[in-house]
Amino acid sequence: MKVLVPATTTNLGAGFDVFGLALDLFNEVEFSFDTKETTIESTGKYASDLKDHNLFFEVLRFFERKTGYRVPPVRIKQTCNIPVSSGLGSSAAVIVAALHIANEGTGRNLSREDLMKLAVELEGHPDNVVPAFTGGLVVCYQNGSHLDFEKFEIDLSLTFLVPNFPVCTNEMRKILPEKVPFEDAVFNIKNSCQFLAKIAAGKIKEALKYVGDRLHQNYRINGNKKMKEFVEAILSKNPEYWFVSGSGPSVCSNINDFEGIPYLKDVLKLRVNNRGMIVSE
């Protein structure tokens, strides 16, 4: 059996912890239960960037604790096509894949919504894992254990600049302030509302004019020397729009001139994936 889990980008600038978008780049995970021991093998372009497979094992054990079901031994082989620790949902892809595998191995007792809630509990916020399940542009709401979302199917291509250094999401969250100026909060509300209004009106490309942010990006950029140099070089190209993908360090921008950008490793031109996770026998 095989499951393909898409890369995701979140926040989209103004929609901090709310907006998530699935992309047409997938980690491919093949699995089989005809084994006596759980093993995980990784191949693919970004496999060498993985430090270990602890997250896979952690998710399988988490599933057992939360559901009471025992996951049988499973042989897992993943092809890593999503950059690791780069703000494109590599951890979310592992979480979603591992939960799907655990559910398959225990009789498919949980619905997609049940798995989604477990994924959000593991990840800590919904904007990566929900679009990985559903595809499309997702607007998420979480209040305690209550999760709600709306999905928009959109036709859009985006360019992501991926640097050659990783960042830790948890560390980048610690950089964020406990309080922000009132006018900064209003700025983000205006942009996020106008972004969604353009999406709802079918004016997809116009929506990208409203990704400006004052709540999280500058704090993260200024808190990491390499990331600051990377973003400043991108901004020197005078892009029409840009935003940090997730907590970084990757950046989405419409520039076409990549000369002189330090640390640049990959340029990924990706379309929105409106289907989400793909399962095949």
UniProtKB/Swiss-Prot annotation:
Localization annotation: Cytoplasm
Annotated Gene Ontology cellular component terms: cytoplasm
Presence of the UniProt keyword Membrane in the record: no
GO molecular function, one term: ATP binding
Gene that encodes it: thrB
UniProt protein name: Homoserine kinase
Superkingdom, natural source: Bacteria
Keywords: Amino-acid biosynthesis, ATP-binding, Cytoplasm, Kinase, Nucleotide-binding, Threonine biosynthesis, Transferase
Physiological role: Catalyzes the ATP-dependent phosphorylation of L-homoserine to L-homoserine phosphate.
InterPro entries for this protein: GHMP_kinase_C_sf (IPR036554), GHMP_kinase_N_dom (IPR006204), GHMP_knse_ATP-bd_CS (IPR006203), Homoserine_kinase (IPR000870), Ribosomal_Su5_D2-typ_SF (IPR020568), Ribsml_uS5_D2-typ_fold_subgr (IPR014721)
Swiss-Prot/TrEMBL catalytic activity: L-homoserine + ATP = O-phospho-L-homoserine + ADP + H(+)
Positions of ATP binding: 83-93
EC number(s) on file: 2.7.1.39
Similarity section: Belongs to the GHMP kinase family. Homoserine kinase subfamily.
GO BP terms: threonine biosynthetic process
Pathway: Amino-acid biosynthesis; L-threonine biosynthesis; L-threonine from L-aspartate: step 4/5
